[in-house]
Design a protein with these regions (language model features):
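Gly/Pro-enriched, hydrophobic low-complexity segments
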Residues: 19, 23, 164-269
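An acidic-aromatic
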Residues: 94-145
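Post-signal peptide N-terminal segment of secreted/secretory-pathway proteins
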Residues: 67-109, 115-116
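N-terminal leader/targeting segments and the immediate start of mature chains
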Residues: 18-70, 74-80, 266-269
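C-terminal motif of bacterial Sec signal peptides marking the signal peptidase cleavage site
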Residues: 13-16
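Edge/loop elements at the starts and ends of beta-strands within beta-rich repeat scaffolds
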Residues: 56-65, 76-81, 88-93, 169, ...
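Positively charged n-region of N-terminal signal peptides that target proteins for export
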Residues: 1-6
Length: 269
């Protein structure tokens, strides 16, 4: 379960941008002004700029999604064994994950539905079934099946469209800050309307929880603008660095979700 938590928490900070209807406050710092001789933008001008910007950042529309993700991570003890996560999902229905080592030997298979998570350990011959709320308890992050699916695909989460409190333009792109109920999220978008960075901070200072993610290697092989390599720096008491490399990703194709538990497997708590 701890390994599953690492993968899910790592994907948690994959946030992009979505449309907005209002801005509570617009701040333009001196360092972020590009055209020095231009008039200072009014509040209405800034609202229009942000609306135009977010209209160009489109969400990924999908029915199904699958990908092979190579996961490398480092904690306080140094580099940990890397693994490969084969992920498949059907929108609003389920998430299927198969974890294997670099030799292709599968160790764990996971099935997540709207109300439960099942973890089958093929090496220990055990099956563990828990309510989906257990993921929230492990990660201390409130999310649903839909949230997890959006995160894996790369669509926005914890980026409140009605709570943008900061907007600035630089020579290289734009920055937007959203204040949500749990997190604040500073997103940097380049001039090609690709999300380059996302910095997520917990609003509860006692948890001292933060995450930085950088997006690389965008491509449109499947007709969808998709970041195939991401680096994350997660911090909450201890530091965790994660690298995700997406391969063989597919959208809207037929796929199966095999999850048959052998009779000899023992159910554990």
């Amino acid at each position: 379960m701890k390994l599953i938590s690492i993968l899910l928490i790592a994907t948690l900070v994959m946030a992009a941008c979505r449309s907005t209807k209002k801005i509570q406050k617009a701040i333009v710092t001196k360092d972020s002004v590009v055209v020095v001789n231009s008039p200072v933008p009014t509040h209405i001008d800034t609202v229009q700029m942000v609306n135009d910007l977010l209209r160009n950042c489109k969400q990924i529309s999908y029915g199904t999604f699958s990908a092979k993700i190579k996961v490398d991570y480092f904690n306080s003890k140094g580099k940990q064994p890397d693994f490969v996560a084969n992920v498949r999902l059907r929108k609003d229905s389920l998430i299927w994950i198969s974890l294997s080592n670099d030799l292709g030997i599968e160790g764990i298979r996971v099935l997540i539905t709207k109300d439960s998570i099942k973890v089958m350990d093929k090496l220990a011959n055990t099956i563990q079934i828990r309510p989906l709320s257990s993921i929230q308890e492990i990660s201390q992050i409130p999310f649903s099946l839909s949230d997890l699916q959006e995160l894996l695909v790369g669509n926005p989460i914890f980026f409140n469209r009605d709570s943008i409190t900061y907007y600035s333009k630089t020579a290289n792109g734009f920055s937007l800050l959203s204040m949500g109920a749990v997190f604040k999220n500073l997103v940097t978008i380049n001039n090609s309307f690709q999300v380059e960075k996302s910095k997520v901070d917990d609003l509860d200072g006692k948890r001292n929880r933060t995450a930085d993610i950088t997006y690389y290697e965008y491509e449109t092989k499947t007709g969808v603008l998709f970041s195939t390599y991401r680096e994350m720096n997660l911090s909450q008491q201890t530091k965790l660095d994660v690298q995700l490399k997406f391969k063989d990703y597919k959208f809207n194709e037929e796929m199966s979700f095999p999850f048959t538990v052998p009779k000899k497997f023992k159910r554990i708590q």
